[in-house]
Amino acid sequence: MPKGCLVITVSGLAGSGTTTLCRNLAKHYGFKHVYAGLIFRQMAKERGMSLEEFQKYAELHPEIDREVDRRQVEAAKECNVVIEGRLAGWMVKNADLKIWLDAPIRVRAERVAKREGISVEEAFMKIAEREMQNRKRYLNLYGIDINDLSIYDLIIDTSKWSPEGVFAIVKAAIDHLYEKV
């Protein structure tokens, strides 16, 4: 692994490839992979709730979102960490590299359908509804417009590249950053 201390955030909408990229980065560089989903599961366990119970609880308690985000910020104090989450780029203001992955909703729906074993149409509807709800929630909770990509250093349309191609693009950026630290 190159020398230095980097904090990288990877954000994107459902089916854009954030988890795949983060796993590849963690494996290649030995980065610690922190993701909001894991933090959320840990919090459910801490409260003795199933994931489903905790999701319903979190919908009624905005402090859960704030705690997930706080824990992501805390993780950013470590060296050589990749933090995955829709708001990670917004929350981890001092990240060395902020990445946004995107793809047309139809492509993302196909990926989610394959991953979850549902129809593309069902995945499309779930994604569209979730994105609308999340956008409202982020605006209300933080005043953040998730569609504002101006904070990102690197924006990649993952429909144009294989997972290996996306990794190669990001690897080139990280290797360049390591030359500077």
UniProtKB/Swiss-Prot annotation:
It holds the Pfam family Cytidylate_kin2. GO terms for cellular component: cytoplasm. It comes from the Archaea. It comes from Pyrococcus abyssi (strain GE5 / Orsay). Its main location: cytoplasm. This is Cytidylate kinase. SUPFAM superfamilies: P-loop containing nucleoside triphosphate hydrolases. ATP binds at G12, L13, A14, G15, S16, G17, T18, T19, T20. Keywords: ATP-binding, Cytoplasm, Kinase, Nucleotide-binding, Transferase.
